């Protein structure tokens, strides 16, 4: 996958197009990511020990990884991702500016 947990991304298609957020979790086997504040759904929860009231809560749902683009650290604009080897390690870099995305 071209994005990882902690990356700042922008949604490029769907109902939340244009929104930006940080990736909270990545699910590589399903090709989906959980982005903070994006794709909010209402979830009905039964009363339990932790939540005796129960009710309806709003939470993020995963979206397909093809619908997000990482933001370039230099320009703050969405960018495609390239890979190159630096000091024997494969790193991701922003195609827009050439800036390395991996810390």
From Swiss-Prot:
Tell me the organism.
Anoxybacillus flavithermus (strain DSM 21510 / WK1)
Q: Read off the Pfam families from this record.
A: KOW (PF00467), ribosomal_L24 (PF17136)
SMART domains per record: KOW (SM00739)
Question: Per its UniProt record, what CDD domains does this chain match?
Answer: KOW_RPL26 (cd06089)
Give each disulfide bond as a residue pair: none
Q: What does this protein do?
A: One of two assembly initiator proteins, it binds directly to the 5'-end of the 23S rRNA, where it nucleates assembly of the 50S subunit.
Species lineage: Bacteria, Bacillati, Bacillota, Bacilli, Bacillales
GO cellular component terms, alphabetically, are: ribonucleoprotein complex; ribosome
Q: Name one GO molecular function term.
A: rRNA binding
Q: Which PROSITE patterns does this chain map to?
A: RIBOSOMAL_L24 (PS01108)
Arranged from A to Z, the UniProt key words for this protein are: Ribonucleoprotein, Ribosomal protein, RNA-binding, rRNA-binding
Q: Name the family the entry cites.
A: Belongs to the universal ribosomal protein uL24 family.
Keyword rRNA-binding attributed: yes
Among InterPro entries, the record links this protein to: KOW (IPR005824), Rib_uL2_dom2 (IPR014722), Ribosomal_uL24 (IPR003256), Ribosomal_uL24_CS (IPR005825), Ribosomal_uL24_KOW (IPR041988), Translation_prot_SH3-like_sf (IPR008991)
The Gene Ontology biological process terms listed for this entry are: translation
Give the NCBIfam families listed for this entry. rplX_bact
Protein known as: Large ribosomal subunit protein uL24
Subunit and interaction comment: Part of the 50S ribosomal subunit.
């Amino acid at each position: 996958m071209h994005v990882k947990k902690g990356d700042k991304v922008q949604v490029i298609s769907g109902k939340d197009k244009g929104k930006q957020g940080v990736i909270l979790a990545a699910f590589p086997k399903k090709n989906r990511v959980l982005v903070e504040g994006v794709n909010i759904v209402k979830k009905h929860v039964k009363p339990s020990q932790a939540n005796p009231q129960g009710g309806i809560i709003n939470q993020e749902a995963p979206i397909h990884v093809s619908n997000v683009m990482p933001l370039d650290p230099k320009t703050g604009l969405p960018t495609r991702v390239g890979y190159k080897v630096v000091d024997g390690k494969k790193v991701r870099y922003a195609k827009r500016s050439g800036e390395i995305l991996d810390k």
